[in-house]
Amino acid sequence: MCSIRNFQMISQLFLACTSKGVSELEHISHLPTKFPFELVHRLTIKGGTGDLKAICFIPSFSAIMIHTGAIICILLLVPLPEFLHLSGASGSSIVGGKVSKPHSKPYMASLQYQEKHSCGGILIRKDFVLTAAHCKAQGDMTVVLGAHDLRKKEKSQQRIKVAKFCPHSSFSGKFDFDIMLLKLQNNATKNKYVKPLDLPKKAKSVSDKLNCLVAGWGKTGPNEPDSKVLKEGTERTLPNTDCEKIWGDHFKSQQMICTTFNKKDGGICQGDSGGPLICKKKLQGITAFTASGQCDNTLYPHVFTNINYFLPWIKEMMQTKSLC
């Protein structure tokens, strides 16, 4: 695979490397929009300025910039608060959609690292927030509940430190088992601004063609800033085969939910990771990933962790103090 010494700068935002040499390097923006590839590896390189994400591809044909069969690695230079999980959904807001009615979603949590929004979360009990495992920070995190406008110190807000991070034990930094519980240092005070969202009573499969709610404070577009107010959008569930065609082995049909969106109704983007997918008023998923820098591209399905699959794990973790 690729090594750090093989990386070469090809733009201010990207480095590239190949395992078999490069015949010609082009600026990343010159790559075809619909580049037929198979995602094969992703590296995390921890440095003083945050995590660097490298995504490697094996092209299915001889491209203008490589020899046939070479491996390309694209290194995304991103600060930790905007850490991207394949897509950037992990530091994300809603593309399109609309501003939520203030405090209409009292279960929404903003996970903050160094006082900056990094991920979404869902309050599921007064002492637990559910989110994505890839949202785990390298240092202390604070959960902000009862918020609408993150620029303000609203009286409705409750800021509670995370006492313990409890990611799934099988999460390895890839895309499966991407679920985590946050044990709060203090119990949240339940009121009209802060209220847990119930988990499904029993596991059920999620049907295709369902319109589902998503919400978050993430980016409003690939090159746009984070939203400071809570936004919401609508995503529509797709057959698992649609995601399997694009994401290959990285899409686990039992563990994940596949969705699409239109730009008017909105969809997830960087910073929305860990937020909810709510179908028929029931919590069904956790925002996980989509294509890097392509959160507003409807060619690439969005992926959510399937809560139904992990219900036994969630309940066991919350009921057993020694586990979380």
Regions found by a protein language model. Name each.
Residues 80, 91-93, 111, 129-132, ...:
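Conserved H-D interstitial segment of serine endopeptidase catalytic domains
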Residues 154, 166-170, 187-230:
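Active-site substrate-binding loop(s) of clan PA
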Residues 7, 14, 35-37, 57, ...:
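Aromatic (phenylalanine/tyrosine) cluster motif
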Residues 10-18, 59, 67-85:
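Cleavable N-terminal signal peptides of Sec/SRP-targeted secreted and luminal proteins
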Residues 101-140:
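Catalytic histidine site
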